[in-house]
Amino acid sequence: MLFRSNTLTEVLCAAGIREYAVSETQKYGHVTYFWNGNRSGKVDETLEVYEEIPSDVIPFEQAPAMKSKEITEKMVENMASGKFRFLRCNYPNGDMVGHTGVMEAVVYAMECVDSGLKAILEAADKYGYTVLITADHGNADQMTETKKGKTSVRTAHSLNPVPFIIYDKDNEWIIKEGAYGLANVAPTIVKMMGLTAPECWEASMV
């Protein structure tokens, strides 16, 4: 498969920015291969560090925390190191546990993600980072559906809009009114970092 050019990683590497990416096996490809436009390997070996945390081979509803604790620890550790200007992670819990349809497990899974995000935000305050929080689709947000008057468990992805949250204790960022999608995330990131976006990109949200 041909990879797509003008990815965010290419722009960051061209600017000499060091990056860190982490997730567990279930979503590792989403912060590496898919993130880089279907590119196997790194754009620049000297600037990028990828870390995969092996997922447990167990039904997700039996271990809904998944590897959220380990992902959080790796993020905080690398934020504290000061080695990276741009870091990214993916928590698979809402999607993978959401597919099981087991409500109690889904609630606990999202509590684990909440706990992880709390630690990352605290680290951002301590080490001077801005945090962006978003998703590529929903699942855990809609666990039931009603058809012909009958309510049943829903295990598929939802079609609800996803959030885009900017957390920055030192700066105020205003998201402009508009209809946005994932294609607007990279332009927003480079603008916030003071970089120039490729002309082929969509508009920044700020």
Residue ranges with predicted function:
Residues 1-206:
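Feature captures the catalytic ectodomains and active-site-proximal regions of enzymes
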